[in-house]
Amino acid sequence: MKLTLNGTWFGNICQFHNYLANQLHFPAWYGRNLDALYDCLTDLSADTEISLQNWPQTGAMARVMRVMQDAAEENPHLQISVM
């Protein structure tokens, strides 16, 4: 699966979590926080490529990006690119 996320799409971190959970079919128990994000991303078993465009380099969204990159280091099925 290929997914492009544009940082300008999300007015807040909750919108991001809801959108990503929907797109990647995260389980109902997904807690919409950074720990849950990491857990769900490292559990992905299908090849998944996520491209981050216009991504904020500070604040909550920057922390999300770091968590996604950390998860990609642990999961060979996940690739994160920042444009």
Describe the residue ranges of each PLM region:
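Positively charged, polar, low-complexity stretches
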Residues: 1-83
